[in-house]
Amino acid sequence: MKTKLIILGCGNSMGAPRIDGYWGNCDKKNKKNARTRCSAIILRGSNSILIDSSPDVRRQLLANNIKNISSVVYTHEHSDQTNGIFELRPFAFKKKGNKKVNFWRKGNPVNVYGNFSTIRLLKKRFDYCFKSFYGYPAIVKGNIIKKIFSLGNYDEKINFNTKQVTHGLIETTAYVFENTAYISDCNDLSIVNMKIFQNLKHLVIDCLRIKKSPVHFNLDEALYVHNCLKPKKTILTNLNSDLNYDFLLKRLPKNVLPAYDGLKLNL
């Protein structure tokens, strides 16, 4: 069965354009420079696994005609990865098997997964999503990930291997699945020595800007990681408005591609 990864959003925490209309170096005439906040989805049969619920997730799912979410895996607890969690509410109304769920009695909460810190902070910030609140049932159920775990049933199952990597002062979860690694927020150059990231078909990697950052890879660092790990293809994500799509495309090696919203990868 074929598996697909869609980059729903590839922008940094402010997106492009920013809310004040600032495009930076990005040419607004090129649609690939319009970037919503980082999020992605894995599709395999009826199994739809969302990676992060960005503040733009409603718009992202509608734009890509995604009508079901089976579960969500979170990379970390920052707002640009999590603030769309309430948008998961319609999926708690979905049928469970052949039975229609009575949402108002018990709901059918969406399973969300993350490391201990992420789930703990999500429950604190969005308590009304995780438990019954003023008569409204919970819409999500928190689960702490194991190093290796699977989501889905039978031939639609996706197997995950995970690694905690440094993102400034916190740890973020890098997910490896279907010979693909997704590392959207990271400044941990030690990943070049980690076996889990070797012999990949696709590497989706943080690349914030040209200048160095204390919490993200910049362009030179992302290319260093690519050259060390040697995946068949690297996709740069978490791009801020300094990085114009065509500027990157002309300067990158043939097997390195700047992400854009809606980019589809066959895994």
Spans of features found by a protein language model:
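Binuclear metal-dependent hydrolase catalytic cores
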Residues: 1-183, 187, 192, 249-267
